[in-house]
Amino acid sequence: MTIALGKFTKDENDLFDIMDDWLRRDRFVFVGWSGLLLFPCAYFALGGWFTGTTFVTSWYTHGLASSYLEGCNFLTAAVSTPANSLAHSLLLLWGPEAQGDFTRWCQLGGLWTFVALHGAFGLIGFMLRQFELARSVQLRPYNAIAFSGPIAVFVSVFLIYPLGQSGWFFAPSFGVAAIFRFILFFQGFHNWTLNPFHMMGVAGVLGAALLCAIHGATVENTLFEDGDGANTFRAFNPTQAEETYSMVTANRFWSQIFGVAFSNKRWLHFFMLFVPVTGLWMSALGVVGLALNLRAYDFVSQEIRAAEDPEFETFYTKNILLNEGIRAWMAAQDQPHENLIFPEEVLPRGNAL
């Protein structure tokens, strides 16, 4: 038996190699294989959003004006979700709903599914871009792992939550005021602020902001005074290899302030990565729970006592009444097709009224 030793040579004109060479070439804007997913999806998502907020009404889906053409501004314009009657239809332009009619497709809310799906794949493409570049320059993939947090939140809020409900109608519309209304909806129908996963998300995001501020200030405070420039930006050569701040001094300072301090940079920066990403993942898990209508904390004993004793009230019972008011107002406004009528006697009243 003969064993051939040596490197296997492929045809130099192999199509894959030609594509790989062109896609991964060093240029001003790196393309890469991930760019085949990222750039088209990001282009279509942004293009669909700009088109919808500029021209497309929400009269047929929500009974609202939602475009610049109708008098909205940047804060009130939105690409609105499809009507509740369309359930979870993908609303393809060539599908049975629009039948290739672009105007009808826009009226039905087709731009929302278009933006949501292309946006999700665009974000995934951006994460793959970070993986690809990290591999090319031999870095660890922690940037891509960190970016999984925002992707998890986007997918859970815009896709998984409405999939758990009766249709895309209950997802957020793509607009500033529309997102605010969705937040109020989450509070009224799910008591979201009392959900422990939301609490972890808030702790992660605000904790990360605090860590960022502390870290930036500490590094600025402990910069070496070895430059000749008039300020921080001119004092150092951007390509210098040596360290420009003192970790030892920073450790001594925070040890005196708190009694404890990070002893090395790896643990410090891993903690700065861990806090926000874990918070985002926890909030995404919480939204998945809401998609299934899971309850969070219900302090029933306080509700019963407040109902029996006019003089007993807690911040929790006040918030529950507020949630009932949100539901009574929003349900009738957002779902007129349900013909919801709430008589005066069933509307919530606090013990003080």
Swiss-Prot record:
Function, as annotated: Photosystem II (PSII) is a light-driven water:plastoquinone oxidoreductase that uses light energy to abstract electrons from H(2)O, generating O(2) and a proton gradient subsequently used for ATP formation. It consists of a core antenna complex that captures photons, and an electron transfer chain that converts photonic excitation into a charge separation. The D1/D2 (PsbA/PsbD) reaction center heterodimer binds P680, the primary electron donor of PSII as well as several subsequent electron acceptors. D2 is needed for assembly of a stable PSII complex.
Residue numbers binding pheophytin a: Q130, N143
GO molecular-function terms, A-Z: chlorophyll binding; electron transporter, transferring electrons within the cyclic electron transport pathway of photosynthesis activity; iron ion binding; oxygen evolving activity
Assembly and binders: PSII is composed of 1 copy each of membrane proteins PsbA, PsbB, PsbC, PsbD, PsbE, PsbF, PsbH, PsbI, PsbJ, PsbK, PsbL, PsbM, PsbT, PsbX, PsbY, PsbZ, Psb30/Ycf12, at least 3 peripheral proteins of the oxygen-evolving complex and a large number of cofactors. It forms dimeric complexes.
N-acetylthreonine modifications at: T2
Annotated Fe cation binding sites: H215, H269
Binding site for a plastoquinone: H215, F262
Any GO BP: photosynthetic electron transport in photosystem II
Record PROSITE patterns: REACTION_CENTER
Top-level taxon of the source organism: Eukaryota
Record InterPro entries: D1/D2, Photo_II_D1/D2_sf, Photo_RC_L/M, Photo_RC_L/M_CS, PSII_PsbD/D2
Coiled-coil residue windows: none
HAMAP family listed in its UniProt record: PSII_PsbD_D2 (MF_01383)
GO cellular component: chloroplast thylakoid membrane; photosystem II
Record's bilayer topology term: Multi-pass membrane protein
Modified residues (Phosphothreonine): T2
Other remarks on this protein: 2 of the reaction center chlorophylls (ChlD1 and ChlD2) are entirely coordinated by water.
Gene: psbD
Transmembrane segments: 41-61, 125-141, 153-166, 208-228, 279-295
Residue positions binding chlorophyll a PD2: H198
EC number: 1.10.3.9
Family: Belongs to the reaction center PufL/M/PsbA/D family.
Name under which the protein is recorded: Photosystem II D2 protein
